[in-house]
Regions:
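Generic serine detector
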Residues: 83, 98, 121, 131-132, ...
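Conserved phosphate-coordination/catalytic loops
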Residues: 81, 85-89, 164-173
């Protein structure tokens, strides 16, 4: 198996996956990211607390949702924003054509060689799931958010807690998880001691 592992923003997407969210809620992205970039220093100074600069933006999204700036923002809504992303030319065609290329090659057929595409991103997993590339992707690693009842709207939910994160360091962990095939075999984890022959995808 040949695994092709992609980043998302500015790699597949022309811009950032949060852009349609800011546009929908009339939030200035420049001001938002300036606020986010100041948070690590602020929390260290005020509370002597270190935060992860790669994922602190998730806290800010949750804060905005609770304050009503991102009114009604939940996982379903995040997924809907995936359909509004603008991909670079050739995306998602490259995923389909690369699979077809190997599937139609006699030598690849003989040795059962195939290609799988993965996305590892510090962005929202739900946004990726709602995008046009998802049907071509074997699996994704991204940030996941937990919902809670929306205090501002009865019967609705909003993003409320952080469930899972990927940052620039744990992207390496994701690569090892793909290597060992933990997404295909629940009995295997990233710390499992597997020989090279036992690993689903070789480096």
């Amino acid at each position: 198996i040949i695994a092709v592992i992609w980043d998302f923003d500015k790699t597949l997407v022309d811009g950032y996956m949060q852009d349609p969210i800011f546009e929908e809620y009339n939030i200035d992205p420049k001001n938002f990211w300036e606020e986010v970039n100041k948070l690590p220093e602020r929390y260290l100074k005020e509370q002597d607390v270190k935060v992860n600069p790669d994922t602190i933006y998730l806290n800010q999204f949750i804060k905005y949702a609770k304050e009503g700036k991102f009114a009604g923002l939940n996982n379903d809504k995040l997924k809907e924003f995936g359909s509004k992303l603008k991909f670079y030319p050739g995306i998602p065609d490259i995923f389909r054509t690369s699979k077809e290329l190997l599937a139609n090659d006699p030598a690849c057929k003989e040795y059962n060689i195939k290609v799988e595409h993965y996305i590892v991103s510090t962005g929202f997993a739900q946004v990726i799931r709602g995008s046009s590339v998802m049907e071509h992707i074997e699996d994704i690693w991204g940030c996941e958010l937990i919902e809670a009842p929306d205090p501002n709207q009865e019967g609705c939910s909003i993003i409320s807690e952080i469930g899972f994160t990927i940052d620039n360091s744990t992207k390496t962990r994701a690569i090892f998880e793909i290597n060992k095939g933990i997404n295909k075999n629940q009995d295997v984890n990233v710390n499992s001691n597997l020989s090279e022959e036992q690993r689903r995808i070789s480096f």
